From Swiss-Prot:
Domain of life: Bacteria
Major location category of this protein: membrane
Organism of derivation: Aliivibrio fischeri (strain ATCC 700601 / ES114)
Keywords: Cell membrane, Membrane, Transmembrane, Transmembrane helix
GO CC list: plasma membrane
Name of this protein: UPF0397 protein VF_1566
Membrane topology of this protein: Multi-pass membrane protein
Family: Belongs to the UPF0397 family.
Coiled-coil segments: none
Membrane-spanning segments: 8-28, 41-61, 75-95, 110-130, 147-167
UniProt cross-references to PANTHER family, sorted A to Z: UPF0397 PROTEIN BC_2624-RELATED, UPF0397 PROTEIN SPR0429
Pfam families, per the entry: ECF-ribofla_trS
InterPro entries tied to this protein: ECF_substrate-spec-like (IPR009825), UPF0397 (IPR022914)
Cell compartment(s), UniProt: Cell membrane
Amino acid sequence: MNLSAKTVVVIAIGAALYGIGGLPMFGIPVFANTTLKPAMAVLALFSVLYGPIVGFLVGFIGHWVTDLFAGWGVWLTWVLGSGIVGMIIGLFPIITKNRIESGLFDKKDFLIFVVLAFFGNVFGYGTSAFLDTILYAEPFTKVFMQLCIIAAGNTFLIAIVGYFILNNLAKRKKQSTNLTEAP
């Protein structure tokens, strides 16, 4: 995999923002070892703008950073889950044929965005929950409850914040595509 210098910088910035923004002091505790993180909107934004590879790496590296700085040790199962969430949300520009770059973001695009966020959270953190029960002998009911809360909460958070960001981004892109040079 050959990543350009720009892509590496984007991944570093995204991972830093997602990682630091994911610290407990910026989250809302909702269940045992479970926090709703507004930083999920950062992961969604970088994934939508730069695609699945950047989305995966921002989620994976960023969650690793969160775990390192939080002091509870790196939980690779949940680090992987965040990477999968970013990768799935990163399918948005492929599915929508990068319409947002042309200044288009309609209800259908928003629905696609929310569905990707939901499936990304269910599949990504579902993988984490499954691996926790196998590798760490975590109680199934606990990790299943974590999964349900995280999937619902993150999808809601990503949908609300993401709508405003992506809608405004599309408007900005549309304005810049309408600019013409005077003769």
